[in-house]
Amino acid sequence: MIIPAIDLIDGKVVRLYQGDYGQQTTFDLSPQAQLQSYQDQGANWLHIVDLTGAKEPAKRQTTLIAELTAGLSANIQVGGGIRTEEQVAELLSLGVKRVVIGSLAVKEPELVKGWFNKFGSEAICLALDININQSGEKIVAVSGWQSGGGKSLESIVEDFSQVGLKHALVTDISRDGTLTGANTELYRELSSRYPDIAWQASGGIATLEDVAAVRDSGAAGIIIGKALLINQFNVAEAIQCWPNE
């Protein structure tokens, strides 16, 4: 499945290179119009990242996210700076279908497991951003990639499997924003090892060939941000390559 994405800083559509706030590109686009266009081209799911909130949780762009969600009929998945049960509940009450939890799942797993028990595994997606070291270990980074987490991807997945983990978005940081192609070997390995989890691929998508390669890897969906913003291809073409379920 194709999941078009936009990243937001202070209400503007942006892209970061490898998660670095110092390497930001701002696009002269309306977030609402951009998401509406993606929906009109056939997207059933849309992914919104609140980068302001990810960096400074007190400045989460909840009002904007509420407006965006209200104006769209597609399913919305939202991440960035979510730290409390109240924030999860608020987003779900605004009509967001799934919240994306990153750093906190690594730092405070018991807290986040409680949210799975309260809201259900369909309502939460874990975002695991990984650095693959020379030994091939998949180490999860935390805090908007500004610091290393030290835990392996597998250890986190196995921990959260106890509460019914269903959705996980995995980004190979070395590919993010690079347009060098996705790490399809990674998604092939994960979907074969953990077939009950719907893996979302992210990072490096540049061409429809990349989309097809991820489709064939066993991943359940693909997050596409930069490639759409710079018109490498459009959502309709991507869905033609990988139709909605």
From Swiss-Prot:
Pathway: Amino-acid biosynthesis; L-histidine biosynthesis; L-histidine from 5-phospho-alpha-D-ribose 1-diphosphate: step 4/9
Entry keyword Isomerase: yes
Enzyme class: isomerase
Reactions that this protein is recorded to catalyse: 1-(5-phospho-beta-D-ribosyl)-5-[(5-phospho-beta-D-ribosylamino)methylideneamino]imidazole-4-carboxamide = 5-[(5-phospho-1-deoxy-D-ribulos-1-ylimino)methylamino]-1-(5-phospho-beta-D-ribosyl)imidazole-4-carboxamide
Compartments in which it is found: Cytoplasm
Gene Ontology cellular component terms for the protein in this record: cytoplasm
Main location as per UniProt: cytoplasm
GO MF entries: 1-(5-phosphoribosyl)-5-[(5-phosphoribosylamino)methylideneamino]imidazole-4-carboxamide isomerase activity
Active site: D7, D129
UniProt keyword terms in alphabetical order: Amino-acid biosynthesis, Cytoplasm, Histidine biosynthesis, Isomerase
E.C. code: 5.3.1.16
Any one Pfam family match given in the protein's UniProt record, by short name: His_biosynth
Family: Belongs to the HisA/HisF family.
HAMAP family reported in the protein's UniProt record: HisA
NCBIfam families noted in UniProt: 1-(5-phosphoribosyl)-5-[(5-phosphoribosylamino)methylideneamino]imidazole-4-carboxamide isomerase
Protein name from the UniProt record: 1-(5-phosphoribosyl)-5-[(5-phosphoribosylamino)methylideneamino] imidazole-4-carboxamide isomerase
Species this chain originates from: Shewanella sp. (strain MR-7)
